[in-house]
Each structure stands twice: as C-alpha cells, then as structure tokens.
Amino acid sequence: MSQLPEIIRTIDRVSADVVAKAATFQAAILSDVAGRRGTMHGRVAPVHQNMKVAGPAFTVEVRPGDNVMIHAAIALAQPGDVLVIDGKGDQTAALMGTLMLSACKKRGLAGVIVDAAIRDKLEILELDFPVFSAGFNPAGPTKYVPGRINHPISAGGATVNPGDLVVGDADGVVVIEREKAPAMMALADKKVADEAARIESIARGDTAAKWLPAALRAAGVLKEGETL
C-alpha cells in the first residue's frame, strides 16, 4: 500500500524556458517528435478552437461527478500550472463552471484540462482563459468524495505525471514527460523547418510523396519494380 499522502504539495516542474518554447509549437508537431505518444483522446477538446495552453501539469484525480479535490487543487496550484483532471471521462455531471474557472484565472494558472464534463460554456467563451473538456452538462457535481492531487493519472487515455509538459490547441492535448521535454524542442524546430520546406515544394508542383512507393511495397500492395 502506498505511503504517499493523498495530497502531494511539492512537485518538480518542467522548466519555464521549455514551456515558453513549447508554446510556440502546434500540439501535432510535439506529438510527432515525441513518437506519436502522449496524446489525449479527441473527446478532450478546447471550448473554443482558438484556445491554447502550455505548462507543467498539476494533476488531480476525482471520482466521477465529484469536485471537492479540484477545489483543493485550485488552492494549491502555482501560477503557470495547468490543472489536469482525471474525471474518468464522465458526462453525467459538470465538474467545473464559471466560478471555479474564474478562480483559476485569477490565481494565474495557465489553463485547465478536464477529462469530464464542465458547464457554463457561453460564460467560459467570454472568460479569455484556456479550458479543455470532454463535454458539457448542466448538472452540478457533489463535493464530498475523496481523491488525490499530484499523483500519476490517466486523462483522455494519456499518462500524466505531475510536472510533465502539457500543450493543447485546436487539435487536442499532448503530454510529454518532464525529463524528455527539453530534448523534444530541438526535434520540434527541425520538424517545423522540414514541413515548411515540404510546403514550399508542394507549392512548386512537387506533390509526390517520395516515401510512398517503398511503403506500399513493404506493405505488399505494390510488387517489386511496380510503381503508382
């Protein structure tokens, strides 16, 4: 049985420099260079497509439909943190709404990611604060079931450890392990440059994917010597 407390107050966070650099990349770029791992299920999406978030994960695990631990997490999280909540994908009640999210913004959090329903969509759109969720439900939550703060969680099918790098945009959310995040930044720079060069070649009329014939042969679709 774990001897760790249910609430862990002190965590190691991905550095501010890495967060600032990561914020310049699309989530898709970071997902590619991280080996196409760590992306959350598409159900976890921004309330508005223009919302973006980047920062260290401050993790919360709750029982479906109960938000007492989220209130505790808001009180403990530091400016720049991204609240990442494992709500088990539950859609039967909203875990957060305008009041709690306004408190998150006031405390300087970078954003909130909830693998569960939230509510007050129209007000959130006016809040100018990045929020990602698995859906919406007008029903409110209960506030008495214990949970955990800053333990490893699963949100949207992705493993999230406290302090990991979290980046979200219109495409969804990607999580990169804190220890690996710095090395991913140079790879992301190269990926962006490579894609820009490819877009330029497409604009010149070179639309052929050079790798495709070999891939089709390896898959057994094309015979040796056969071309498209």
Specify the residue positions occupied by each region the protein language model found.
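Feature captures the catalytic cores and cofactor-binding loops of soluble hydro-lyases/lyases
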Residues: 2-162, 176-228
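C-terminal binding/interaction regions
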Residues: 166
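Histidine- and aromatic-rich ligand-binding microenvironments
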Residues: 169
